[in-house]
UniProtKB/Swiss-Prot annotation:
Compartment list: Plastid, Chloroplast thylakoid membrane
Source lineage: Eukaryota, Cryptophyceae, Pyrenomonadales, Geminigeraceae, Guillardia
Annotated organism of origin: Guillardia theta (Cryptophyte)
Residues on Stromal side: 24-37
GO terms under biological process: photosynthesis
Keyword hit for Membrane: yes
Signal peptide residues on this chain, from the entry's feature table: none
Protein name: Photosystem II reaction center protein Y
Record InterPro entries: PSII_PsbY
Cellular component GO terms, alphabetical: chloroplast thylakoid membrane; photosystem II
Keywords per UniProt: Chloroplast, Membrane, Photosynthesis, Photosystem II, Plastid, Thylakoid, Transmembrane, Transmembrane helix
Segments in the Lumenal topological domain: 1-4
Length: 37
């Protein structure tokens, strides 16, 4: 693998995983709120 490709992909992957983590956390909170009713 080319090092430049890795340098370009690392921040993109970090941002995508952070967004996915936040979305999953909010979704789980919504589901638990629906289940507690």
């Amino acid at each position: 693998m080319d090092m430049r490709l890795l340098i370009v992909l690392l921040p993109v992957l970090a941002a995508a995983s952070w967004a996915g983590f936040n979305i999953a956390r909010i979704a789980l909170r919504q589901l638990s709120r629906l289940g507690s009713r």
